């Protein structure tokens, strides 16, 4: 999940030039960003497009996406009149509440001048360097969305339900996320078989 990489109040970043600095963005904000991606499965632009008015306590309504400085409908054409809806699970609720201001309105993730936070900038200046220090590769915001799909699939959630959570227009789009999962499960199964065969071979040798 990577939330533990940003467990403090502030973040210390080690630059490639040997510099060490503390970015303006708080650790709590980065945790909330990751949680929205991982627990709600929102796309990059949809995360940027969230307003506090979209937070309805037990659900997020998805009305807009932000690309660069442009506010537009989401990839699946959700908007003010026909918003998408994603349940807010307890871990996400806690992390959103941690950054919620007293009079919450406007962007959930604002930048310093009142616009939508630039996730690409945060990724390059903050997240990637922290990942690197811990020996991890950044796979992109989409990886959290795919991870959510994978985890739901492993829990036995029907494809159509996962489709609704990820807000895909077609269930076939959802199912394509499981190609990797199926291969990983197959590899794991074959490794277990390999270990079993090794044990059987050892027993056979002892008998002989």
Identify what each model region corresponds to:
Residues 6-21, 68-92, 98, 102-104, ...:
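C-terminal secondary-structure termini that scaffold catalytic or DNA-interacting sites
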Residues 53-61, 138, 157-176:
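Short, polar N-cap/turn motifs at the start of nucleic acid-interacting alpha helices
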Residues 100-101, 132, 153-157, 167-170, ...:
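Hydrophobic alpha-helix feature that most strongly marks membrane-spanning transmembrane helices
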